């Protein structure tokens, strides 16, 4: 039982570290995007490209 608790605690700790690192990386990426408006436009194009493709394929716009 003690080893199970120890393992779960270790997994929880590693998960918390992973989440905090991901948040820091995401925040850094957002700061970079604010600096470069062209990069923001590319993100929007990437997001809407599949929708436009589906619209053309199924012709339900």
UniProtKB/Swiss-Prot annotation:
Family as reported in the entry's similarity comment: Belongs to the frog skin active peptide (FSAP) family. Brevinin subfamily.
UniProt keywords, alphabetically: Amphibian defense peptide, Antibiotic, Antimicrobial, Cleavage on pair of basic residues, Disulfide bond, Secreted, Signal
Localisation: Secreted
Tissue expression remark: Expressed by the skin glands.
Source species: Rana dybowskii
Chain residues in the propeptide: 23-45
Record function comment: Antimicrobial peptide. Has low activity against the Gram-positive bacterium S.aureus (MIC>100 uM) and the Gram-negative bacterium E.coli (MIC=25 uM). Lacks hemolytic activity against human erythrocytes.
InterPro entries linked to this entry: Frog_antimicrobial_propeptide (IPR004275)
Domain of life: Eukaryota
Predominant cellular place of this UniProt entry's protein: secreted
Name of the protein described by the UniProt record: Japonicin-1CDYa
A single GO BP: defense response to Gram-negative bacterium
Disulfide topology: 55-61
One family name in Pfam for this protein: FSAP_sig_propep
Signal peptide: 1-22
Entry GO CC: extracellular region
